[in-house]
Design a protein with these regions (language model features):
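N-terminal accessory targeting/assembly segments
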Residues: 1-90
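Structural beta-strand/beta-sheet cores of well-ordered domains, especially the beta-sheet scaffolds
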Residues: 2, 14, 25, 37, ...
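Short, surface-exposed secondary-structure edge patches
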Residues: 5-10, 42-48, 62, 70, ...
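Short, surface-exposed secondary-structure boundary micro-motifs
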Residues: 7, 21, 59-60, 78, ...
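Short beta-alpha junctions and helix-cap segments that line functional grooves
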Residues: 13-15, 26-28, 41, 56-60, ...
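A residue-level detector for short acidic-glycine micro-motifs
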Residues: 17, 31, 41-43, 75, ...
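P-loop NTPase nucleotide-binding/switch module
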Residues: 84-127, 132-139, 144-146, 156-216, ...
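P-loop NTPase catalytic core
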Residues: 206-211, 215-519
Length: 519
């Protein structure tokens, strides 16, 4: 953290650049006390001297939005990593996230004289066979009139494709590029309904039907390796009914981030037969990067997801791990000498997590189209402590909990999701019960609860057998135990590399469930 003395107005979260040794280091204002401003630098401060000058930009940390982001690898500040050379990132090196020279075929969707509001669809371009909308500026107030719109043709992202006239008569030129502060949620929608959607993973669906984009997923991996987390993430990314996939590697080890960079481009999209990377964006910040950049990465990922949601697309956002993000918040809070909460996390950690998760969801746009963000957050508590503040507050917000267990992974029972510790609060909602009755049958929730009871009973009997031996428990106990094992093998275990078993339609899941119940 660096303390600056300013001679003018400064805003909270404003971005500034500090000059040192010929480099300009990006920093963010995190606290203002009179003429003293405390900033958190996004890069190493080695060599920074007293008296160095700082230049304030007048805006918050922003992302640049537009065509050309798909299949890109970014860092937390949206620098294009593919444009950077060397093994390690150089300090003070920033790259533009989009390709200014690429040509896009623009197709208008409005005509002169039409009335539009912020984020209204003005036209469309295709990127990797994915139709993307060119929208009115998100920052526009009120209603504007389309003064001119360019005809169908080829344009660059900086070319003016439309001119809007606002209510005061001012002209607003529109290009394919937009900027948006990452810590501000996009609220350019009419409402947030609550739909549900069936997933194709048996281990999750048969315990509870997963909510679609519009709710929040939650994965909890134990802080151990080789528990099948990566394969499960790949399976969800490939099989999800999502148009766009965004991966945020927040504060993970460098070798885990390298796995993402090397393995994701090789995955084949089962829906199209093309590479999954063509509709994927990867945002990476390793654990050795400054805490401010680690915090920024999850906000950057969410802002990109909101941008695509405004186009009426389904976005899958996976963040690994939100615990590192929370630890970055703790470090900055401690440096500012704020009153610490449990485990030295900020006192408002609950509100911060709630506000961030609240940006995800299913929305109805102004033109009655729908878009959605499904957020899968990975939490890695130290020592596997489920009672630590980040895990507790995330569970309250997400209401859906996957407990990845090392013991199941050691037994090669994949996906290694513990069926006893995992749960979903959604099955308690009346609207969820109505959805199940309408789309599956009236007995589904009862059957799922019956299976979970059998699994719980089987676990208790397994502990008794381990203590007393096979001859120390009645025969009927063995029957209950092996029935629970049958449920585990047939329903909860799934081969992510098998063409048939990797994704299971709801009809097949229902048939398997009924067959097991009758045994």
């Amino acid at each position: 953290m660096v303390t600056l003395v300013v001679d003018g107005p400064v805003a909270q979260n404003e971005i500034c650049y500090i000059s040192t040794g010929g480099d300009k280091l990006m920093a963010e204002v995190i606290k203002v006390v009179g003429a003293n401003v405390y900033v958190q630098v996004f890069e190493s401060t080695r060599g920074l001297k007293v008296g160095a000058e700082a230049e304030f930009t007048g805006h918050m940390l922003e992302v640049t939005l537009g065509p050309g982001m798909l299949s890109k690898n970014y860092d937390g500040l949206q620098n294009d990593l593919d444009k950077m050379d060397g093994v390690f990132l150089k300090r003070g090196q920033y790259t533009y996230p989009l390709d200014k020279e690429r040509i896009w075929h623009f197709v208008p969707m409005v005509k002169a004289g039409d009335k539009v509001v912020a984020s209204a669809w003005l036209g469309q371009v295709d990127e990797n066979f994915q139709p993307l909308k060119i929208m009115a500026p998100f920052t526009m107030n009120g209603t504007a009139t389309v003064k001119t719109i360019m005809p169908e043709g080829d344009y660059k992202i900086e070319d003016t494709i439309a001119i809007l006239t606002d209510e005061e008569g001012n002209d607003i030129p529109v290009t394919m590029i937009q900027k948006w502060p990452v810590k501000r949620a996009m609220t350019n929608y009419k409402e947030k309904p609550r739909p549900f959607k069936i997933a194709g993973n048996r281990c999750t669906c048969n315990r509870y039907v997963e909510p679609d984009c519009g709710r929040w997923y939650r994965i909890y991996p134990r802080p151990l390796r080789y528990n099948g987390k990566t394969v499960l993430q790949h399976a969800i990314s490939k099989q999800a009914e999502a148009d766009i996939v965004i991966i945020a590697a927040c504060g993970e080890r460098a070798n885990e981030v390298v796995e993402i960079f090397t393995e994701f481009p090789e995955l084949v999209d089962p829906h199209t037969g093309r590479k999954l990377m063509e509709r994927t964006i990867i945002i990476a910040n390793t654990s050795n990067m400054p805490v401010a950049a680690r915090e920024a990465s999850v906000y950057t990922a969410m802002s990109l997801a909101e941008y695509y949601r405004s186009m009426g697309l389904k976005v899958l956002l996976m963040a690994d791990s939100t615990s590192r993000w929370a630890q970055a918040l703790r470090e900055m809070s401690n440096r500012m000498e704020e009153l610490p909460g449990p485990d030295a996390f900020p006192m408002d950690i609950s509100a911060i997590i709630s506000n961030f998760y609240g940006r995800a969801g299913y929305v109805k746009l102004g033109n009655d189209e729908t878009g959605s963000i499904t957020f899968i957050g990975t939490v890695s508590p130290a020592g596997g402590n489920l009672k630590e503040p980040v895990t507790e507050n995330t569970k309250k917000v997400a209401r859906c909990f996957y407990a990845l267990e090392q013991d199941r992974a050691d037994k090669k029972r994949y996906p290694a999701v513990n069926p006893i510790d995992s749960y979903s609060k959604y099955i308690e909602y009346p609207e969820f019960e109505e959805y199940i009755k309408e789309h599956i049958n009236d007995e589904w929730i009862g059957k799922v609860n019956e299976l979970k009871t059998r699994l719980q009973r089987g676990k208790e009997i397994a502990e008794q057998i381990n203590i007393l031996g096979d001859d120390g428990v009645p025969v009927e106990y063995h029957v209950i135990f092996w029935k629970s094992e049958l449920i585990d093998f047939v329903i909860l275990q799934q081969d992510a590399f098998d063409e048939v078993d990797s994704v299971t339609p709801m009809e097949r899941q229902e048939a398997i469930l009924n067959m097991i119940i009758d045994i």
